[in-house]
């Protein structure tokens, strides 16, 4: 059959199609119209738009007056109804990748179903571009201080009693406590074991959990993991004598930590279940209180070494210890959520679900990400984490690629407690810079847009990259050593290299960050470089801090 092109016919055809196209644009597709998804937000278009400085010691923000006004009205009406400020729950997974959960395309597809997590996510705001720091401890400190690692100074996870932590920093739990909140920490801490950095001394009324990280309790005891240590009395005794806590502990504000039990590999199997039970009891207690609460809940799963509870062993289609622990984490989250639901607390509770970094690709079996890199790197796979926020009746179900950093939880929670926007600047010393941006109106506004213009990435205390819109500019990158395998994903054993200055990637067309467009699209690099230089000016006035580092 012969095809002939007619410009006249093309014009007529396009004209006839325009009404249909407009109608289709106004109507969600079948896929996005299903219950729980009101549609997908367009990403930010902030590349060449200026941000506004609201306080000298706070990150400049993109302002949206209409959504700010709507949000404050919603909060005022809710407080009038409930008689108290909203509760905040942060549910923080460990080493879980962006694509481990069903709401990001994983779950069943990767052999570890997360049905309850996905169900709640579908009724909340799924954040496809939420960012952590490259590893655990820096991220946890970022959540509790509102600062990037370069400012709070925890650049690496402290290991085996290494000194340093949150001491001397202004923390979210302390500020919320000052506002009348009951503050509870449960689970993994890993922000310093020295007394001044322990949770009961940095703002929490109560703490139940462990001070460090899973593998530090088990790797020197498990003959299947480290036989060269576990089977050597001298070596295992050496580790045992190092000055780090080896127990599941409990403490109350200002008190001493009390050991509950020695954390052996066998005890580790039940740890997440024990912590979950403690969390349920806390929520039940708060259901009878007239005070708002802040629950910071850090799971043990799914950091290596994974010891799934006996009833979850073999429960995942993947049949791996990691997959089994993911199934267990789904149930832990579900039990906490159902307790809030049973108690009628969902109407007045912001739930934040997230992970502390990307998957730990150096220790299989591990999590998954569709992006380049993994934990320990500033490639997207190392720092883009599975995240959603949920608040019954307050957050419109949708997805957004608006940029969010976990530092944003600090000013956002303080906004809910009665300190919106620039008021946060007065709660911290003038020498403290808040890298977080108040995202309350983004979360609660109708089709809200992110208030954050840019994401900044850090490696070993240095500014490594910046992202605005879909574009990302690297000045430092992490690459594997020459002896590692070609499929290496990046982590703590890589090497940091400086780029030649034109490493710009379009994360929409190249999520693997494999084909730089810096030379072909120089105009895209200009605003990114400008943003990087602007943050360097911030660092001159508010210098970097390094208290826990790799060297």
Swiss-Prot record:
Name the coenzymes or cofactors required.
Answer: Ca(2+)
Record's keyword terms, sorted: Calcium, Hydrolase, Metal-binding, Periplasm, Signal
Would the keyword Nuclease be found if you checked this record's keyword annotation? no
Q: Name one Pfam family in it.
A: Sulfatase
Q: Which family does it belong to?
A: Belongs to the sulfatase family.
Q: In its UniProt entry, what is this protein called?
A: Putative sulfatase AslA
Tell me where it resides: Periplasm
This protein's gene is called aslA
Q: Which Gene Ontology terms of cellular component type are present?
A: periplasmic space
Source domain of life is Bacteria
* Gene3D superfamilies assigned: 3.30.1120.10, Alkaline Phosphatase, subunit A
Broad enzyme group: hydrolase
Note on cofactor: Binds 1 Ca(2+) ion per subunit.
Cleavable signal peptide: 1-24
Q: Which GO terms describe its molecular function?
A: arylsulfatase activity; metal ion binding
Q: What does this protein do?
A: No E.coli strains have been observed to have an arylsulfatase activity. A 'latent' activity has been observed by heterologous expression of a genomic region linked to tynA, but it does not map near aslA.
For the modification 3-oxoalanine (Ser), the affected residues are 136
| PANTHER family per record | ARYLSULFATASE FAMILY MEMBER (PTHR42693), ARYLSULFATASE G (PTHR42693:SF42)
